[in-house]
DNA sequence: GCTTTAAAAAGTAACGT
DNA sequence: ACGTTACTTTTCAAAGC
């Protein structure tokens, strides 16, 4: 059975962690090749890993935000690289810092074009934001799982706000069911 | 106790002044947009409801007033684009859109998506186009919307393309630039929507 | 609320050629 | 009239203004 759920692709994973140690970002900016640090602009130092491709925001408190990774494994790999780089610089890093996934962005394809006008009314104007003058996607806030889904006329969708890998799958099954019940799924 | 009394009066006066300012701003912007008095009244009601439900806290009075007017135009079936509303407001378009979404949600306005057909009479008359062109543009919008071409597209661009196509079909040709100017969209957008609509109509 | 980072979706806009 | 780049929307953490 190949359905919309099989078309789900994780596009971005955001996670947070901490090394349990305060950092001197000025010194770190000098010691870490490729680091971007503009304290006037933003308090975090930006460091990008190449493989896996990800970007980390490193803060004075030792807390770190990792974003841009394509999977949870990639988040762990990217942060592992960063932890090792810090240890190389003689900065004490906790043995296994706890990594918390904060947000997962996925895309999927429902396989049919969507009439967004009919969908806005069918799904309930109170739960829908559809302002094509400002953005071509219909914004649907789902309570369970608690995610936000962007639906497009092409049938392509974006699921964001989930913290678990299977939130996207559950959400896609749910939205397909709701659209189908309205008779709006081609 | 006297101080408390004075503060109440001060707060009440400040509130009155703010309300008066908001209502006069709605009036000023409505005049500039050329919307009828009934729409200004609807906008005033929306503003007062937002005020009563404490939706203005953390937002600018002008932003809420502008959004109330934008919402009122839609509710009354004579929408103005965010661009048009932003032109007569001192609030940036982005804030108007954000504030509109907020008050619309909180007040449960439940306004349907803007229908491109609602822009046809105003745009067409600004271009001195006949009743016949308007009817044709309306037909083009209906036919292409039924074929699913409207999803995700800007209502103003969709209306502009239909008017351009109708002006050609009725031998009252307007250039893409002329139509683009009144609808405040680019010629590129008109061209793109026009091509799809002509195909939907079975021409080509 | 803002600042920064990443990513997808599709439409619109503004460049330069 | 191309092509490219960039902006719109959503989500989330971080520290500080």
From Swiss-Prot, chain A:
Sequence repeats lie at residues 10-86, 101-179. The keyword Repeat applies. There is a cross-link at residues 53, 63 (Glycyl lysine isopeptide (Lys-Gly) (interchain with G-Cter in SAMP2)). PANTHER family: TATA-BOX BINDING PROTEIN (PTHR10126). Keywords: DNA-binding, Isopeptide bond, Repeat, Transcription, Transcription regulation, Ubl conjugation. InterPro entries: TBP, TBP_archaea, TBP_CS, TBP_dom_sf. General factor that plays a role in the activation of archaeal genes transcribed by RNA polymerase. Binds specifically to the TATA box promoter element which lies close to the position of transcription initiation. NCBIfam families: PRK00394.1-2, PRK00394.1-5, PRK00394.2-2. SUPFAM superfamilies: TATA-box binding protein-like. GO terms for biological process: DNA-templated transcription initiation. The lineage of its organism: Archaea, Methanobacteriati, Methanobacteriota, Stenosarchaea group, Halobacteria. The keyword ATP-binding does not apply. Belongs to the TBP family. Pfam families: TBP. This is TATA-box-binding protein 2. One of its GO terms (molecular function) is DNA-binding transcription factor activity.
């Amino acid at each position: 059975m190949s359905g919309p759920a099989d078309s789900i692709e994780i596009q971005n994973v955001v996670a947070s962690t901490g090394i349990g140690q305060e950092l001197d970002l000025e010194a770190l900016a000098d010691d870490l090749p490729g680091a971007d640090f503009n304290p006037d602009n933003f308090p975090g130092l930006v460091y990008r890993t190449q493989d896996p491709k990800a970007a980390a925001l490193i803060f004075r408190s030792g807390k770190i935000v990792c974003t841009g990774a394509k999977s949870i494994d990639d988040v762990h790999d990217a942060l592992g690289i960063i932890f090792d780089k810090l240890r190389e610089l003689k900065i004490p890093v906790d043995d296994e810092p706890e990594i918390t996934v904060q947000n997962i962005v996925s895309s999927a394809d429902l396989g049919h074009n969507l009439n967004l006008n009919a969908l806005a009314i069918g799904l309930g104007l109170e739960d829908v934001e559809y302002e094509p003058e400002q953005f071509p996607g219909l914004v649907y806030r789902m309570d369970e799982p608690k995610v936000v889904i962007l639906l497009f006329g092409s049938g392509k969708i974006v699921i964001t706000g989930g913290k678990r890998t299977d939130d996207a799958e559950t959400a896609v099954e749910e939205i397909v069911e709701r659209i189908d019940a309205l008779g709006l799924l081609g | 106790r006297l101080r408390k009394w004075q503060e109440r009066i001060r707060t009440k006066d400040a509130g009155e002044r703010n309300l008066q300012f908001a209502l006069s701003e709605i009036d000023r912007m409505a005049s500039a947009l050329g919307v009828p008095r009934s729409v200004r009244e609807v906008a005033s009601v929306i503003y007062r409801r937002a005020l009563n439900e404490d939706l203005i806290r953390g937002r600018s009075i002008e932003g809420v007033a502008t959004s109330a007017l934008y919402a009122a135009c839609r509710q009354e079936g004579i929408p103005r684009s965010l661009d048009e509303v932003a032109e007569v407001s001192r609030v940036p378009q982005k804030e108007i859109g954000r504030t509109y979404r907020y008050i619309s949600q909180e007040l449960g306005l439940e306004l349907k998506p803007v229908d491109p057909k609602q822009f046809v009479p105003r745009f067409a008359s600004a271009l001195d186009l006949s009743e016949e062109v308007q009817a044709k543009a309306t037909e083009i919008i209906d036919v292409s919307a039924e074929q699913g071409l409207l999803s995700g597209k800007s209502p103003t661009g969709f209306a502009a393309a239909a008017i351009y196509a109708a002006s050609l079909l009725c031998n009252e040709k307007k250039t893409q630039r002329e139509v683009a100017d009144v609808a405040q969209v680019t010629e590129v957008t008109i061209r793109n929507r026009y091509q799809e609509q002509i195909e939907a109509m079975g021409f080509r």
